[in-house]
Amino acid sequence: MAKRDYYEVLGVNRNATEAEVKKAFRRLAMKYHPDRNPGDKDAEVKFKEAREAYEVLCDSRKRASYDQFGHAGVEQTFGGAGAGGFGFGDLGDIFDDIFGDIFGGARGGQAREQRGADLAYELVLSLEEAVHGLSRTIKVPTWINCKTCNGSGAKKGSSPATCPRCNGSGQMRMQHGFLQVQQTCSVCRGRGQVIKDPCTDCHGQGRQQQTKTLSVKIPPGIDTGDRIRLAGEGEAGLFGAPPGDLYVQVRVKPHPLFHREGNDLHSEVPIDFTTAALGGEMEIPTLDGSVRLTIPPETQGGKQFRLRGKGVKALRSGAVGDLICHIVVETPVKLSPEQKDYLKQFAELLKKDEKNHSPRTRNWFDSVKDFFTSK
């Protein structure tokens, strides 16, 4: 059976905020949680469906993938929602609100601050930038504390009042037969206070949307998959609560000359067949300038030369990798008739000589001969 749209499951629109998604899930969890519907298979299915939708829509990366590619995007990129198994521990504060007080066990009932959401930002770097490090300015759309009310949500000169329904606890106790549960107050949404005279700039939310400009220091040696945490640079919390963090995810672009493996750099170095046979010197580029590489006579294709200390300085240990040059011997092309004649004469000279000028070729033919004669 085809999966339902996650937004439809939770009953929210596609532009719903994280807080709205969480609120919708709380409502469904209260209604369909298995502990409140023992033996009801239909309720269990609906609860699992709501939980799966919540896990995707409250995760910024999963939600972006879902919005673009649907269910297939989440399954292919993240292994599907709830890939870690069906459990309740990862829903933390939501189940604290719903089942914080079972069988009369009090939990203290104090209002809880709603910390701002964490943000993710992908930073694309060149290989040179990743190896040497730099400072980069980035622009991040986010929520900041309202400067007019300093995040309180109340109009200047006024202040929030104690919620008349929960008396400032932020939570309400509900009795369902022998089961007593404690849930977030629907009036103050767990804050314990209400705004009677809201700030006109932020409309009582205590925060406003703004694009924040930040300077990020990129340490030398960083690589794709590494991330930098900027504490407190995420979204502002609701009504003056602490902000979340910003995680800068690094992605290094492919380089035309070098391929990185750990702290080593690899590069293909093409040489003509005369240099391979007679030897010579070449100018080899590195990320710190060029160096001279001596090619010894009779160098074969696939030969590797290791240039010590010309790789990447490790991000944590400080050890420096090497540059490994992979020799590629090129066969000449677009030969003139005269050049072809010289090569034919050269080939005849090699045949007349009893020396083994191509040991790998001879060994290969000997192996082929042995293979067929042994049949």
From Swiss-Prot:
Its main location: cytoplasm. CXXCXGXG motif repeats lie at residues 146-153, 163-170, 185-192, 199-206. Its cofactor is Zn(2+). Belongs to the DnaJ family. One of its GO terms (molecular function) is ATP binding. Pfam families: DnaJ (PF00226), DnaJ_C (PF01556), DnaJ_CXXCXGXG (PF00684). This is Chaperone protein DnaJ. The keyword RNA-binding does not apply. The gene is dnaJ. Homodimer. PANTHER family: CHAPERONE PROTEIN DNAJ, DNAJ HOMOLOG 1, MITOCHONDRIAL-RELATED. A zinc finger (CR-type) spans 133-211. GO terms for biological process: chaperone cofactor-dependent protein refolding; DNA replication; protein refolding; response to heat. It is found in: Cytoplasm. Keywords: Chaperone, Cytoplasm, DNA replication, Metal-binding, Repeat, Stress response, Zinc, Zinc-finger. Participates actively in the response to hyperosmotic and heat shock by preventing the aggregation of stress-denatured proteins and by disaggregating proteins, also in an autonomous, DnaK-independent fashion. Unfolded proteins bind initially to DnaJ; upon interaction with the DnaJ-bound protein, DnaK hydrolyzes its bound ATP, resulting in the formation of a stable complex. GrpE releases ADP from DnaK; ATP binding to DnaK triggers the release of the substrate protein, thus completing the reaction cycle.
